[in-house]
UniProtKB/Swiss-Prot annotation:
Natural source organism: Lolium latent virus (isolate Lolium/USA/US1/-)
Note: TGBp1, TGBp2 and TGBp3 seem to act together for cell-to-cell propagation. TGBp1 is the main movement protein that physically cross the plasmodesma with the viral genome. TGBp2 and TGBp3 would facilitate TGBp1 function.
Chain's gene name: ORF2
Name used for this protein in its record: Movement and silencing protein TGBp1
GO biological process: symbiont-mediated suppression of host innate immune response; transport of virus in host, cell to cell
Subcellular location: Host cytoplasm
Length: 268
C-alpha cells in the first residue's frame, strides 16, 4: 500500500485530511483529466503481480503480456489480491461496489453520482493547456490547473454552431446528436469520450453553462473540454422554430456545419 502511495505522491497527488480506512479498503483517489491517474494505475498493475486493476469505462489498457486495466462488468473480485477500480464515478452508487482496495475517478466526470470523500487528490493536468483550464473553471466552477513549468497555453473559441465545427465534435444525446447524424457529420457523444483525447475538440450545447448550472450539465461540459490537448471550440446550438430543421443557407453537399473528412483541415 505504501508503494502505491509513493507512486501517487511522485505524480503530484496530495494527501487530504480524510482518515485512511483501517482495513486498507476503499482508499479513494481523485484526479482531474490529464493528471496521470489512469496511467499510474496501469503502470502499477503491470509492475506488480499481486495487483488487479479494472475500469468502469470500455477503455481497457494492456501491455504485451496482457497485464494492465480490464473492464469491470460486475464480476467477483479476488480479495486476496490488491484491487483497484478506475472511474468509479461512472456508477450510480459507488457505495454498492465490491470492497476494492482503491476507488479512483475524476470527480468532475461523475455526473451520475456524488463522489466519495478522497484520501489523495490532484488538480493538476498534464494534458489540458493553460487557457483551456481557465475556461473550464470559468464555465463550470471546477478547479483544474495546467501542470508543468513550460506552460502550453492552448486556445479556445466561443461562437454559434453555424461556425465550422472542427473535429473532434462532442455533443449531448438529444437534438444536436440527431441533427448531426442526419447530416452524416462525424461526432461522438460526450459520454462515449471518457478516456479519450484529441488535439482539437468542438463541444456543442443547446444552452448556456455557468457555475450555477446543474451539476450533471457542468460535468458533461467538463468531460468534453478536458479531452482537448490544444484547442477547444465552444459552440451554442439554437434550434429553429420548425422542429427537426436547421436553418442553413448552403446546400447539404457543401454545408459548413458538416465536417466531412474531406473538409477537415490538416493536423500537420
Amino acid at each position: 500500500m505504501e508503494d502505491f502511495f509513493n507512486c501517487l505522491r511522485s505524480r503530484g497527488f496530495e494527501r487530504t485530511d480524510e482518515p485512511l480506512p483501517s482495513d486498507s479498503r476503499r482508499i479513494v483517489v481523485h484526479g482531474v483529466g490529464g493528471s496521470g491517474k489512469t496511467s499510474l494505475i496501469e503502470a502499477f498493475a503491470i509492475a506488480n503481480e499481486w495487483v488487479r486493476a479494472y475500469t468502469l469505462t470500455s477503455h481497457e489498457r494492456f501491455d504485451i503480456s496482457g497485464r494492465g486495466i480490464s473492464q469491470y462488468k460486475g464480476q467477483p473480485i479476488d480479495e486476496k489480491l490488491w484491487t483497484i477500480l478506475d472511474e468509479y464515478g461512472q456508477t450510480d452508487n459507488p457505495e454498492t461496489l465490491p470492497p476494492f482496495n482503491v476507488l479512483a475517478t475524476d470527480p468532475y466526470q461523475a455526473f451520475r453520482c456524488q463522489p466519495l470523500r478522497a484520501h489523495f487528490v490532484s488538480l493538476r493536468s498534464y494534458r489540458v493547456p493553460h487557457h483551456i483550464a481557465q475556461a473550464i473553471t470559468q464555465y463550470t466552477g471546477f478547479p483544474i490547473e495546467a501542470a508543468g513549468t513550460d506552460l502550453h497555453e492552448g486556445k479556445y473559441t466561443v461562437g454559434p454552431w453555424t461556425d465550422k465545427l472542427r473535429q473532434q465534435i462532442l455533443v449531448e444525446d438529444g437534438e444536436i446528436h440527431y441533427q448531426l447524424s442526419r447530416r452524416q457529420c462525424p461526432h461522438k457523444l460526450i459520454t462515449d469520450a471518457i478516456g479519450e483525447q484529441w488535439p482539437t475538440v468542438t463541444v456543442v450545447f443547446d444552452r448556456s453553462i455557468s457555475p450555477e448550472s446543474a451539476r450533471p450539465l457542468r460535468c458533461l461540459f467538463y468531460i468534453a473540454a478536458t479531452r482537448s490537448s490544444n484547442e477547444l471550440n465552444i459552440r451554442t446550438y439554437v434550434p429553429t422554430r420548425t422542429p427537426g430543421l436547421i436553418k442553413a443557407s448552403l446546400p447539404h453537399t457543401s454545408c459548413r456545419l458538416c465536417c466531412r473528412p474531406r473538409d477537415l483541415p490538416s493536423e500537420n
